[in-house]
Amino acid sequence: MTTHLFTSESVSEGHPDKIADQISDAVLDAILEQDPKARVACETYVKTGMVMVGGEITTKAWVDIEEITRKTVREIGYTSSDMGFDANSCAVISAIGKQSPDINQGVDRADPLEQGAGDQGLMFGYATNETDVLMPAPITYAHRLVQRQAQVRKNGTLPWLRPDAKSQITFQYDNNNIVGIDAVVLSTQHAEDISQKDLHEAVMEEIIKPILPTEWLNEQTKYFINPTGRFVIGGPMGDCGLTGRKIIVDTYGGMARHGGGAFSGKDPSKVDRSAAYAARYVAKNIVAAGLADRCEIQVSYAIGVAEPTSIMVETFGTEKIPTSQLILLVREFFDLRPYGLIQMLDLLHPIYQKTAAYGHFGRAEFPWEATDKAEILREAAGLK
């Protein structure tokens, strides 16, 4: 019997880094709506009273960067200087250039199927059968806590909540099976006039209890609600925010490896994003097919080259068929060339702002979460 603890964290849509991610992806969506073939690499920086949007964008579209920025911040909930940030009065600075022609010549091809990767790099995808969405439980429930925080803030249940929040959950495992939740941390920005006693009680009753399954909670479970005792100053006033600084929150909460490339603000020609989505799609279909209980996929690319330079399948001893056979199935049923995976997952649509808070994986509305290849994989593996 081997027991261990594993912890993952998430942050709300009002966290400074997530504000930046959402602005970058809102700009991307606005451009893709007009020009699906645009090349976009959009970075955002937020600090007290200001937003800077920069990067390299090559497109036939015209979008209003300032209006997109203000609308995004407004939707998150920063609409008053009392919160330290106001969508209506913050400065918006734009510093956008064009994509290098040296990169263009390596990516664009007369035959779309020969489209090269927009950069070199390695990407991972992961799936596990420990939750119904085939994601690790720690990151799944960490996301759900901060999603619930936003819900009760916006619907008026707890009107004194403010947009910035963080969650963290420690799960206890026995032989890789969940046996309970050891610790829950939730820190939320709040109005000045709420007492800590009322805050603790409301967070427990309205956020934590409705989300966490009771069978995983016991008398030993520890709760840390606003452990510093006060969280009035938050958002960009408390910390500056940057696109791409929450890559573990965005993916698997540390339970799988990460190639290092961020997602937000990048169009699908950037394999940092699109190939990570494809790797999740592959891993999820392998687990959904019952070919493994856990699966991690690695793919890698060279700039300007269409075919992946490597494909790796790791199943942690849970595979039902040999790993060598799994790799052959991946190569047969999944086109992991940049253009191929864009077509396979239908990525040239404005779907990205929704990904920029509460995780890119484990959410059914995204095409890389489909399990439409599970049946054919199972048949090809001879497990029917």
Swiss-Prot record:
Cofactor(s) recorded in Swiss-Prot or TrEMBL: Mg(2+); K(+)
Top-level EC class: transferase
Binding site for K(+): E43
Keywords per UniProt: ATP-binding, Cytoplasm, Magnesium, Metal-binding, Nucleotide-binding, One-carbon metabolism, Potassium, Transferase
This protein's pathway: Amino-acid biosynthesis; S-adenosyl-L-methionine biosynthesis; S-adenosyl-L-methionine from L-methionine: step 1/1
Amino-acid positions noted as binding ATP in the UniProt annotation, renumbered to this chain: H15, D164, A165, K166, R230, F231, D239, R245, K246, A262, K266
UniProt keyword RNA-binding present: no
Entry's EC annotation: 2.5.1.6
Pfam families the UniProt entry points to: S-AdoMet_synt_C, S-AdoMet_synt_M, S-AdoMet_synt_N
Keyword Transferase found: yes
Domain of life: Bacteria
GO molecular function: ATP binding; magnesium ion binding; methionine adenosyltransferase activity
GO cellular component: cytoplasm
GO biological process terms held by the UniProt record: one-carbon metabolic process; S-adenosylmethionine biosynthetic process
Entry binding sites for L-methionine: E56, Q99, D239, K270
Amino-acid positions noted as binding Mg(2+) in the UniProt annotation, renumbered to this chain: D17
Record's catalysed reaction(s): L-methionine + ATP + H2O = S-adenosyl-L-methionine + phosphate + diphosphate
Subcellular localization(s) per the UniProt record: Cytoplasm
Primary localization class, coarse: cytoplasm
Region Flexible loop, annotated ranges: 99-109
Cofactor info, note text: Binds 2 divalent ions per subunit. Binds 1 potassium ion per subunit.
Subunit (UniProt): Homotetramer; dimer of dimers.
Role according to the record: Catalyzes the formation of S-adenosylmethionine (AdoMet) from methionine and ATP. The overall synthetic reaction is composed of two sequential steps, AdoMet formation and the subsequent tripolyphosphate hydrolysis which occurs prior to release of AdoMet from the enzyme.
Name assigned to this protein: S-adenosylmethionine synthase
Organism of provenance: Proteus mirabilis (strain HI4320)
Gene from which this protein is expressed: metK
